[in-house]
């Protein structure tokens, strides 16, 4: 089990696919995720499960996110984070994203590279 005092660092090799405006609603009303979304989710969940073997975190946490971007193209960071929280839940890293009490996000441009560094630690109230 992961100690509440321990900092956890995880890495994803691909940037999150932003959550909104990526779903297809045909006439039947059922929502489908495009392959780009489902492929990213499956890969991210697998990568997280390979790195995180403990029980899902069930206490208040602070999360530091470093988004490694391959270029200066505009990206929807808020929706990328929503996708990230979802896969962290599905992979069993966190019990629920409502346990995230503090978020610090940094964009880092590294030409030709991409990924996400996730650092999780217990939340300490100011």
Swiss-Prot record:
Superkingdom classification of source: Bacteria
Enzyme nomenclature, EC number: 3.1.21.10
Cofactor: Mg(2+)
Subunit structure: Homodimer.
Segment forming the signal sequence: none
Binding positions for Mg(2+) per the UniProt entry: 76, 78, 97
UniProt keywords, alphabetically: DNA damage, DNA recombination, DNA repair, Endonuclease, Hydrolase, Magnesium, Metal-binding, Nuclease
Function of the protein: Endonuclease that resolves Holliday junction intermediates made during homologous genetic recombination and DNA repair. Exhibits sequence and structure-selective cleavage of four-way DNA junctions, where it introduces symmetrical nicks in two strands of the same polarity at the 5' side of CC dinucleotides.
Enzyme class (EC, first level): hydrolase
Pfam families: RusA
Protein family per UniProt: Belongs to the RusA family.
Name this polypeptide is given: Crossover junction endodeoxyribonuclease RusA
Catalyzed reactions: Endonucleolytic cleavage at a junction such as a reciprocal single-stranded crossover between two homologous DNA duplexes (Holliday junction)
Keyword Magnesium included in the entry's annotation: yes
GO BP annotations, alphabetical order: DNA recombination; DNA repair
Keyword Cytoplasm appears in the UniProt entry: no
Cofactor note: Binds 1 Mg(2+) ion per subunit.
Listed GO MF terms: crossover junction DNA endonuclease activity; magnesium ion binding
